[in-house]
Amino acid sequence: MKDREIFAGLMSGTSLDGVDTALASFQGELPETIATSFTPFPSDLKYKLHHLAVADSWRPDELFAAESQLTLLYAEAINDLLQSADIDRSRIHAIGCHGQTIRHRPAINWPYTCQLGNPSLLAEKTGITVIADFRRRDIAAGGEGAPLAPAFHMHVLQHRFPNCAVVNIGGIANITQWSEKANAVVGFDCGPGNILMDAWCSQAFQQNCDHGGQIARTGSINHALLQEMKKEPFFSLSAPKSTGRELFNHDWLQANLQKTASVDDRDILATLTELTAQTICEALNTNTLTHLFVCGGGAHNLFLMERLSRHLPGILVKGTDSAGIDPDFMEAMAFAWLAMRTLARLPGNIPAVTRAQGERILGAIYPA
């Protein structure tokens, strides 16, 4: 333990379920996961963050109060994990904090992205150097600012799986794919991951998600609704591209439901699951693909995993745990790794993925 450089990663995504925290070392050929934890959002914070992500406007006090509450939860997650793992904070070189995205608009005339999280407060409450604000440098360089995890996906998997794709199914689904023949990598958001399924579960079944895909499995795919949703222009955009809750949200779902004859609640959920599966599979280049590794909450949706396998005959579809990375903490590990890259003054983006003008060192450093 004393010889290892340990980095922490904090990730809270568009699913708004809570904070994933990982402690990791990257000195070996494969990353070493030292400890992990999940800290759920209290209901009031979840409500505030959802409101900030979808509302057309809000008061500054709402924004900054929510940011402070969120940051204190981040600090609590770090401090509690260090205590439970019996690791002294002096051993942690830095925390890579993604923050909570409330807006991501890289394609407008004045492009921007906004992640809540006060790195100064986090450094103060943990006594650990914090690396934050990873996305804006890539946007400043003409990129999408997302996805950033592909560099980490390649780092941990490419040498073992030369013709492979990774899909992170959080609120939004994003793909990383590389092939030995093309000697190139692509990465992009391909559409909704769990975000619409979770929204419908909350509205129709009063639960936060479809555990294991058990409800969707009892429904039938409504092809009229599916085709209506697939008319969304985002799906036909060429990569690189990125999206978020500002597009795929409850209002988007309701607008599509209104264009379709009445559909049973379970059939709607089955159709939303199929939408995620089809838009992922249609975004992949299957010519040389041998493996699809799934991370994020979607890896636990067995019905969704079956639908992915159904659309990808001859391709092995597995959770990233089969490759040695816990699917629940892949993204937190990625931001711990990006923090390491920043401290080492190494680039963290892949221009072919984000469309940036070149490689850039990402993030800002907030010393302990």
UniProtKB/Swiss-Prot annotation:
Swiss-Prot/TrEMBL keywords: ATP-binding, Carbohydrate metabolism, Kinase, Nucleotide-binding, Transferase
CDD domains according to UniProt: ASKHA_NBD_ANMK
Binding residues annotated for ATP, in chain numbering: 13-20
Associated pathway: Amino-sugar metabolism; 1,6-anhydro-N-acetylmuramate degradation; Cell wall biogenesis; peptidoglycan recycling
Enzyme Commission number(s) from the entry: 2.7.1.170
Reaction(s) catalysed (UniProt annotation): 1,6-anhydro-N-acetyl-beta-muramate + ATP + H2O = N-acetyl-D-muramate 6-phosphate + ADP + H(+)
Physiological role: Catalyzes the specific phosphorylation of 1,6-anhydro-N-acetylmuramic acid (anhMurNAc) with the simultaneous cleavage of the 1,6-anhydro ring, generating MurNAc-6-P. Is required for the utilization of anhMurNAc either imported from the medium or derived from its own cell wall murein, and thus plays a role in cell wall recycling.
Protein name as annotated: Anhydro-N-acetylmuramic acid kinase
Name of the coding gene: anmK
